[in-house]
């Protein structure tokens, strides 16, 4: 969808920001060969960017999560959330910086875990949760997604995600 890359996406994000709409961007592999700067025009209009570690390394040409986050922040992104699979999630903005651990699950299929994370993260932000809570909630959704075969059959409800989080906390306290 070349019309949504570069200037096309930037015009959509710019219009959204002008109306006061929060903007979120998940990244994907560079299927069209547009290069790391191919979507850089959206960065000044992006409140939250949520690349996987591999996507972030490609875009920033850096390997250190801190340096990667700085790359996005220096270009105008509000908050950088780097999804790192079983290693957790690195988060940075102008006032916060933290690493959030992943939930330990027996992974059956990781297809769609990043999408589950992003959807849950957006939902949590729109529900007014704090940033660390948003990340934990999103991580829980991603972890639940990994426990079944398929990209979109595991995460069914907010109460399921919250129950998973409570159970994980209980198990951690028992150790």
Language model features: what each stretch is:
Residues 1-48, 53-98, 160, 166-175:
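Ribokinase/PfkB-type carbohydrate-kinase core domain
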Residues 71, 75, 79-84, 101-169:
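Conserved post-catalytic alpha-helical subdomain immediately downstream of the catalytic base
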């Amino acid at each position: 969808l070349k019309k949504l890359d570069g200037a096309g996406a930037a015009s959509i994000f710019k219009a959204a920001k002008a109306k006061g709409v929060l903007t979120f961007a998940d990244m994907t592999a560079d299927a069209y060969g547009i290069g790391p700067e191919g979507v850089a025009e959206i960065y000044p209009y992006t409140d939250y960017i949520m690349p996987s570690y591999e996507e972030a390394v490609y875009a920033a040409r850096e390997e250190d999560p801190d340096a990667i986050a700085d790359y996005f922040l220096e270009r105008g992104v509000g908050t950088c959330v780097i999804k790192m699979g079983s290693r957790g999630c690195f988060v940075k903005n102008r006032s916060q910086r933290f690493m959030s651990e992943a939930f330990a699950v027996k992974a059956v299929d990781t297809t769609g875990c990043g999408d589950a994370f992003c959807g849950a993260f957006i939902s949590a932000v729109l529900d007014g949760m704090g940033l660390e809570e948003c990340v934990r909630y999103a991580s829980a959704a991603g972890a639940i997604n990994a426990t079944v075969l398929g990209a979109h059959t595991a995460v069914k409800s907010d109460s399921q995600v919250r129950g998973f989080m409570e159970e994980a906390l209980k198990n951690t306290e028992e150790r």
